[in-house]
Regions:
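C-terminal catalytic core of tyrosine-transesterase DNA break-rejoin enzymes
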Residues: 1-5, 75-80, 94-118, 125, ...
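Conserved tyrosine-mediated DNA breakage-rejoining catalytic core shared by Y-recombinases
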Residues: 1-49
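Phosphate-coordinating loops and pocket residues in cytosolic domains that bind phosphorylated ligands
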Residues: 8, 16, 125-128, 143
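Exposed loop/turn and edge beta-strand positions of beta-sandwich/beta-sheet ligand-binding modules
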Residues: 17, 30, 54, 70, ...
Length: 147
């Protein structure tokens, strides 16, 4: 999900029973359903139980004004500094997600759908295969072709 989609998310668009988030306002203007899996589901469920929110409430409200989304700048910068990572923006997580999906066998269509891209060209722009992954793929192909 994009940062704006996350920060603008309200509880009425979170379906814990079916483990999914429905994004109504997206960058490309198309409604998108995002599955809530593993750790993300657990974190969102626990947050819901803790806050007991109303439908229109933001999932991540500002502590100063619950009608406004929280600012993540300070937390992001602190996390990046602690992890000793340089030159990494929140948006770069989308590139990482696309790359990990590709390296774990997701099709271009699946990656496009998960990231909310309309074109496969955008998927290509976001997906970056590691050198190790490319070597592994070539090794697999060589074993099949040459035994």
């Amino acid at each position: 999900m994009r940062r704006g989609e996350i920060l603008g998310l309200s509880w009425e668009n979170v379906d814990l029973q079916n483990r999914r988030i429905t994004l109504v306002r997206t960058k490309n203007g198309e409604r998108r359903v995002v599955p809530l899996v593993c750790k993300a589901y657990e974190l969102i469920k626990n947050l819901y139980l803790k806050l007991e929110p109303e439908g229109k409430d933001l999932v991540f409200p500002s502590p100063n004004n619950p009608k406004q989304p929280i600012s993540i700048r300070t937390a992001w910068e602190t996390a990046i500094k602690r992890a000793k990572i340089e030159n990494f923006r929140f948006h770069d997580l989308r590139h990482s997600t696309a790359s990990y999906l590709a390296m774990n066998g997701a099709s271009l269509l699946e990656i496009a759908d998960i990231l909310g891209h309309k074109t496969l060209q955008m998927v290509k722009r976001y997906s970056h295969l590691s050198e190790d992954h490319k070597a592994t793929v070539l090794e697999k192909m060589n074993k099949k072709v040459f035994g």
